[in-house]
Amino acid sequence: MTRAVVIGSGPNGLAGAIALARAGLEVEVHEAEAQLGGGLRSAELTLPGFVHDVCSSVHPLGRASSFFRMLELDVDWLEPDAPAAHPLDDGSAVMLERSLSETAAGLGRDADRYRRLVGPLVDSWSAVERVLLGPYPVPPRALLRLGDRLGTRRLAAALHDSLGAARDFAEREFSDERTRAWFAGHAAHSILPLERRPSAGFGLALIVLGHAVGWPFPQGGSQQLADALAAKLRELGGQIRTSSPVDSLPSADVVLADVVPRELLRLGHGRLPERYARHLRTYRHGPGAFKVDWALDAPIPWRAAKCRRAGTVHLGGSLEEISASEWGAWRGRPVGQPFVLLAQTSLFDPTRAPAGKHTAWGYCHVPNGSAEDMTEGIEAQVERFAPGFRELVLARHAMGPAELEAHNRNLVGGDLNAGAMDLGQLLFRPVRKLVPYRTPLEGVYLCSAATPPGGGVHGMCGYSAARVALKDLERRA
């Protein structure tokens, strides 16, 4: 029987392992940590009974993933009443609603423009998803199908907008400062300066996802998604070995490595050709993250009551403020007043905390590897929009870049995307190669978020790498 070894049990490693097992290969996954899941792990970080997602919580791309849908995973997806909220200093909030029309209604004089920009993309979601989460290079048939749905001119405009900078897009397309700030909050998920390309594309993608599939999370924590993927693999005969670090590339017909480039270099022990190794050494990591988890005595007391309907809240005020925060993180400067992304899943999932209590987390972007403690800055931003928040904190748990990387080696310097996703590294990830998953070593493939389509919980990096491996096996047979 053809044997495959997968290094890493994050969503991409597990997705790749499942794809290989479905094709009849004997699959073994090695996970260095005692708990499987990579960025999908959950734990009681603060107090007993309070379940926190150690890294990722909200998974629009997980719901959108065609591979995850095909697997019919045993996961109970929960949806907040609204995907996201953006509170402002005047006590109001701008909302991303599931309904496009309800969202537009909250954008004032930008409502009609928003409908014209976003409506066609939402209506064409199935075709958009094939381009957004498909393999690299994007199959021509996927672009042709999207062109058929949108029309040639609208497709060209959508591609132009998606590859642009968020600040340029917001100032060109929207006239209301509230709308510009709201869009900037979505675009800042890119971990890019808003003046850098393609930050606009991240903002547009997350907004369209909010309308098309929502911003859901697994009941009981992200670990439930990891466990469901692991159960599917075991059902297919695959094995998972935890507390099983790998120090060199194993001998197998297929090796899928859910690792970042520098880890592949370490595992290769000089076996990789120098030209390829040189490209891997120049792979760039983006800013890191600083995250605080809270056990709370009650829900966060938002001044804007609408924020209580959202699973995710963006805390940054204006476009100018968000831009300054993201530039600071990118340029390696102290962040000062940080843009904070906050998740409050226990409002919609009572399994996350004891009766009447709640959990939440907030994180901000910081310079890669920064040792600065951002707890006070993050909590000040929450208090700014929710006076009395600090009085509700029963316990807190903070993780800076070093702690995040210790938790997951792929988070180099706290970089949540396993590599900067600016235009060059979005299109050529991790190297300029027609098939980026295939390494020069026969049978060895890279399948982490350092390959297309990049960061996020969707499993498509692993699935795409596995498909390449299976095609190569057929050719070698």
Predicted regions and their residues:
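N-terminal glycine-rich phosphate/pyrophosphate-binding loop and immediately adjacent elements
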Residues: 2-133, 420
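Rossmann-like flavin
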Residues: 89-198
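Conserved FAD/dinucleotide-binding core of flavoprotein oxidoreductases
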Residues: 105, 262-266, 295, 354-381
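A glycine-rich dinucleotide-binding beta-alpha-beta segment and adjacent secondary-structure elements
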Residues: 176-193, 208, 337-341, 388-452
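Helical element adjacent to the flavin cofactor pocket in flavoenzyme catalytic cores
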Residues: 203-246
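Mid-domain catalytic core of redox enzymes
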Residues: 238, 242-353
